UniProtKB/Swiss-Prot annotation:
CDD domains, per the entry: QueC-like (cd01995)
Catalytic activity: 7-carboxy-7-deazaguanine + NH4(+) + ATP = 7-cyano-7-deazaguanine + ADP + phosphate + H2O + H(+)
Residues involved in Zn(2+) binding: 197, 207, 210, 213
Name of protein: 7-cyano-7-deazaguanine synthase
Keywords, sorted A to Z: ATP-binding, Ligase, Metal-binding, Nucleotide-binding, Queuosine biosynthesis, Zinc
Role summary: Catalyzes the ATP-dependent conversion of 7-carboxy-7-deazaguanine (CDG) to 7-cyano-7-deazaguanine (preQ(0)).
Gene transcribed to yield this protein: queC
InterPro entries in the record: QueC (IPR018317), Rossmann-like_a/b/a_fold (IPR014729)
Pathway(s) it belongs to: Purine metabolism; 7-cyano-7-deazaguanine biosynthesis
Documented EC number(s): 6.3.4.20
UniProt binding sites for ATP: 13-23
GO terms under biological process: queuosine biosynthetic process
One MF term in the entry's GO annotations: zinc ion binding
């Protein structure tokens, strides 16, 4: 029996492909999963319905949806009236930080996860960041996670008292999108329940052309697995 089988873990769950896989990995490691999602004013609120489906299917002990309003700051195509880039080549995605980057989003999300982890008296947090097939986000890099972990252990009661050491698990950080999909399939993830698109139709269909959709399509193609996503015709 896994030594950490009964430990709790907070998993950041957007409803997308990566976070669903991270949650499945946490479950496979034996953790009791507490899923945390955010309604932050994002244009792609369809992902919240996906998060609810994934949390239920993968057996989260509890699923919290925190309401925060990042539209008051704007600064991103996901939270303001800015166009979402379409049709970009993968190499172009890596040249600059895109307008779909939400300022400090992962720092905000991880801070909420850290607070909940303290309440749950656990030191384990999972986040599905990826530094291989990614859209140039600065808060998806290993050095960012290392820095946040160091801060977390200085900023929490448990960390200061030396009772536990906060650990931020990033099981996908060195995997390609294809490898992530293959890992998820092996763990029984139903990717038909997930949603990745930044600019879906009113009916919730994926646009097929934003960075997130293109990376998703590329991942399924390279993994040799049919893409279950419903795209706009």
């Amino acid at each position: 029996m896994n030594a950490i089988q009964k430990e709790k873990a907070v998993v950041l769950l957007s409803g997308g492909l990566d976070s669903a896989t991270a949650m499945a990995i946490a479950k496979d490691m034996g953790f009791q999963v507490y899923a945390l999602s955010f309604s932050y004013g994002q244009r792609h609120t369809t992902e919240l319905e996906a998060a609810k489906r994934v949390a239920k299917t993968l057996g989260a002990v509890e699923h919290q949806v925190a309401n925060i309003d990042l539209t008051c700051f704007g600064g991103s195509a996901l939270t303001a009236d800015l166009d979402v880039p379409k049709g970009r080549a993968p190499e172009d995605m890596e040249k600059e930080i895109p307008v779909t980057y939400v300022p400090a989003r992962n720092t905000i999300f991880l801070s909420f996860a850290l607070a909940w982890a303290e309440v749950l008296e656990t030191s384990h947090i999972f986040i599905g960041v990826n530094a291989v097939d990614y859209s140039g986000y600065p808060d998806c890099r290993p050095e960012y996670i290392q820095a946040f972990t160091a801060m977390a252990n200085l900023a929490t009661k448990a960390g200061v008292e030396g009772r536990t050491k906060i650990e931020i698990h990033t099981p996908l950080i060195d995997l390609t999108k294809a490898q992530i999909i293959q890992k998820g399939i092996a763990l029984g993830v139903d990717y038909g329940l997930t949603h990745s698109c930044y600019d879906p139709s009113p009916e919730g269909l994926a646009c097929g052309q934003c960075d997130s959709c293109l990376l998703r399509k590329k991942g399924f193609a390279e993994a040799g697995i049919p893409d279950p996503t419903k795209y706009i015709p």
